[in-house]
């Protein structure tokens, strides 16, 4: 294909991405335990406490299931997260209570939503800038950092990854 057209179109890449992430939807968080801190911080905010005043163990108590699941390094630390991340975690805590399983599922779905929004925006921005949408999706979405870290590891950055390029499409 020497005419400059992409060898693979965006739809094929997005189906590939879907095939890669389906197994991750059903796994425990990969490579990190940050999600457990997100859950505890969300419960703190949902309970009307100040997450910047103390750590999850002090605010929720040693016996709270979400406080017990926070990695030792963060158990006594005040929240490092900003108000948007805490607000999202608070809504999830209100929906899921102390259920670690359902909290993880909800956060992972939000990670997927953030990455899906980024994929849509990356295609739109690539077209606007005269760049191959397939190449942009390949570099921006179908890479190990996004697949394993943001979706597998369930990180707040996945939501930001969606907000940022979507906002650029409105400029």
Where are these regions (language model features)?
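Hydrophobic core of alpha-helical transmembrane segments in multi-pass integral membrane proteins
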Residues: 1-2
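Conserved small/polar residues in nucleotide/adenosyl-binding loops
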Residues: 169-170
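Intramembrane catalytic core of multi-pass membrane enzymes that act on lipidic substrates
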Residues: 9-108, 112
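Hydrophobic, membrane-inserted alpha-helices
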Residues: 20-21, 143-144, 164
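Aromatic- and kink-enriched transmembrane "portal" helix at the membrane-lumen/periplasm boundary
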Residues: 100-104, 108, 115, 138-161
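Transmembrane alpha-helix boundary and packing residues in multipass membrane permease domains
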Residues: 86, 90, 120-124, 165
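Transmembrane-helix signature of polytopic, membrane-embedded enzymes
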Residues: 7-12, 122-143
């Amino acid at each position: 294909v020497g005419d400059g057209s992409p060898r693979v179109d965006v739809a094929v890449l997005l189906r590939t991405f879907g095939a890669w992430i389906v197994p991750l939807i059903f796994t425990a968080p990969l490579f990190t335990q940050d999600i457990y801190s997100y859950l505890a911080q969300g419960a703190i905010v949902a309970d009307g406490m100040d997450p910047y005043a103390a750590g999850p163990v002090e605010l929720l108590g040693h016996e709270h299931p979400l406080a017990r699941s926070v990695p030792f390094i963060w158990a006594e630390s005040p929240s490092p997260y900003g108000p948007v991340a805490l607000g999202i975690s608070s809504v999830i805590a209100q929906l899921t209570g102390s259920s670690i399983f359902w909290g993880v599922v909800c956060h992972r779905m939000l990670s997927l939503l953030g990455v899906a929004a980024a994929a849509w925006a990356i295609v739109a921005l690539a077209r606007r800038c005269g760049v191959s949408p397939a190449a942009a999706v390949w570099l921006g979405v179908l890479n190990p950092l996004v697949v394993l870290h943001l979706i597998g590891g369930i990180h707040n950055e996945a939501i930001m990854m969606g907000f940022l390029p979507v906002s650029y499409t409105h400029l």
